[in-house]
Every structure is written in C-alpha cells, then in structure tokens.
C-alpha cells in the first residue's frame, strides 16, 4: 500500500477580505490593529481604518475642527504605518458624525466590510457592573458584518483582585 501526500488545498477556517478597524486614539486601538494584522497576513485582504470625529449638536455637522483633523491624521498615520510594515493593504478614512457608532455602521455597509474589529475600554460602575459606552453596543446591534471586540485591560483592572 502506498500513501501519497495530497497537496494542501484546504482553505483557512477564517478568511476575510475587508476588515474595518475603527480607531479612537486610545489604548484599545493597538490590540484591534494586531488582530487585523494576524487575520490579513499573507492574504490579499485590506484593512480599512476609520476615525470618527464626533460633532456636538451645538455645532454644524460640517464645521471644521483643525485640531480634531490633525489628531485623526496622526492616529491613522501611525496605524497605517504599522499595517503596511506588515504587508497589509490599507484604506484610511475620517468621518464627522453626531455619533461614532452610526458612522462606523454606515462605513461598514458602504465598503461591504466582512468583519469589524474594535477595541473596548472596560469601565467599572459602582456596584460591580461595567460600561461599554455608547459606540460598541450600537455597532454590535446594527452592524451588517460580524463584530469582534477586544477588551483592553486598563491599569484600574490590572490592580483589581
């Protein structure tokens, strides 16, 4: 009896062509970028980076905010450099919206995103509860694509028994 090795034609279990990584400029961004890098490494896939500038209702939605745009450019520039260093194709975007969650969901639908990977800053509430903020729950409820959230361990949590 002769056994021959078949060429490995299996497809990876998880394949994504377009991953959206919303960036807020917090410590929660790095784990999301690292996961997107792992998922897209060695593929023709693309990471779509988005920073949303939330505009308060007191201001016009299209009002210019040079400081916020400069902050967004800095965040997106660093993230783009990290991903391109790892051979990942990158698309970047800045959106102005009243709420970041709606802008993220709209971008995901418009770009036909396969997966959203976002960081979650875990905040404790009195009485032992926790708070995920407004954006992550909104995206999880309304996204046209699967959403993977990575909870970041903050200094507060690291010292909690």
Show where each model-derived region lies.
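Structural beta-alpha unit
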Residues: 1-10, 14, 84-116, 121, ...
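Small/aliphatic-rich secondary-structure junction motif
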Residues: 8-66, 88, 142
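Short glycine-rich, flexible loops that bind phosphorylated cofactors or substrates
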Residues: 28, 100, 124-126
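Short, well-ordered secondary-structure micro-motifs
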Residues: 32, 59-62, 103-105, 128-129, ...
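Active-site phosphate/pyrophosphate- and oxyanion-stabilizing loops and adjacent acidic/basic residues
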Residues: 34-37, 105, 137-138
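Short, solvent-exposed amphipathic alpha-helices that sit
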Residues: 35, 67-79, 103
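General small-molecule cofactor/ligand-binding pocket signal
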Residues: 48-50, 91-95, 148
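Glycine-rich, Arg-bearing micro-motifs that act as flexible, cationic patches
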Residues: 118-142, 156-160
């Amino acid at each position: 009896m002769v056994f021959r090795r078949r060429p490995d034609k299996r497809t990876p279990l998880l394949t994504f062509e377009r991953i959206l990584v919303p960036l807020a400029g917090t410590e929660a961004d790095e784990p999301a970028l690292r996961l997107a890098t792992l998922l897209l490494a060695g593929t023709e896939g693309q990471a779509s980076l988005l920073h949303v500038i939330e505009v308060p209702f007191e201001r016009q939605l299209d009002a210019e905010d040079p400081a916020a745009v400069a902050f967004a450019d800095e965040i997106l520039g660093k993230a783009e450099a990290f991903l391109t260093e790892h051979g990942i194709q990158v698309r970047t975007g800045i959106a102005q919206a009243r709420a970041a969650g709606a802008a993220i969901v709209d971008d995901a639908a418009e770009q036909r995103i396969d997966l959203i990977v976002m960081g979650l800053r875990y905040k404790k509430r009195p009485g032992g509860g926790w708070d995920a903020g407004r954006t992550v729950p909104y995206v999880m409820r309304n996204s046209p694509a699967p959403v993977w959230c990575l909870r970041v361990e903050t200094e507060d949590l690291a010292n909690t028994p």
